[in-house]
Amino acid sequence: YEVGASRYKHHQHTLMKNTMLIPLVTVTWFLFGWWIYWAFPTGPGLAPSIMNESAALVTDESAFSATWYTATSDLMAVNLGDHISGVFWAAFLLFSWTAASIVSGAIIERITTFAFGILAIAIGSVFWTIDAAWGWHFDGWMLKLLGYHDAYASGVIHAIAGGFALGVLMVLGPRIGKFSSSGEPRNIGPRNPWLVTVGLFLIYTGFWGFYAACNIPIFDLGPEYGMEGISYWTATNIYVTPTTLSGITFNFLMSLSGGLLAGYWIAKGDPFWTYSSGLAG
C-alpha cells in the first residue's frame, strides 16, 4: 500500500523501510518489548495495590510476571512443556509491526531508513508496549481504575502510533513538493493505484484476522460468574470477558462498509480515498 502511494523514485526506499522494520522490531520485542508489557501494567509509579490479587507481583514497580518473559527465560525458547507462550508473543509482535508501519506511512518520503529504524524500535517495542500494558492488559491500571475497554486494541495501537507520528511530522515537516513557491498545497496522489488497491485489501484481510485472533482462549467462566456447578465455555477477549466470533464478524464488516460508503461519497468516487476510508472505518 505504502509503496503504491509513494513516488517512483522512493519505491525501493519505501519497500526496504517497511521490510526492515520486521526484523528490527522482532529482535527488540524479544529482548525487552515483551518484558515491558508484563512489567508495567500499573505504571510505573502507580500503587501496586490496584493489581488483581491473582497477579504475581514481584516488585514494588508492579513487575507482574516479568521474570517469566525476559530474553533468558525458559518460556522464551524451545520448551516442550510450554505450548502457547511463543504464539502469544508472536500475536503481540504483529501489533508491534503494525504500530511501526502506521508511523512509516505517516512519514512517507521524509526520512532515512536508519533513522526510521530507530523510530520503529521506539514505537514498536517501547511506547505502544507501555500503552498496551496500561490499557490492553487484564490487570492494566486503565482497566482497573477507569474501566477502559478496547477489545481489539484499536485505540491502544492507533492513538499511540498516530500521536507518535504527529510528533515526528512536527519536526520533519511536509513532503518535498507538497507546497508551491507561493504556499499553495499540491495534491500528491498515489503513483500506482493498483498497488494501493491490492495493499489495502490485504490490510482489510489482515485486520479481520487480527479481530478474530483477539478471541484469545476458550475458558470455563461459570465459576467466575458465580454459576457453581455450571460450565460456561466461551471465547474471551484480552480482559478475560466473554466474546464471540459472530460479534467480531458483524462489527468488522459493518465498520468496513460504513467507511467505504462514507469515503466514496465524500471523495466523489476517488479510489484512493474510498479504500483508505474503508480502512479508517
Regions found by a protein language model. Give the residues of each.
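Hydrophobic alpha-helical transmembrane bundles of multi-pass membrane proteins
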Residues: 1-281
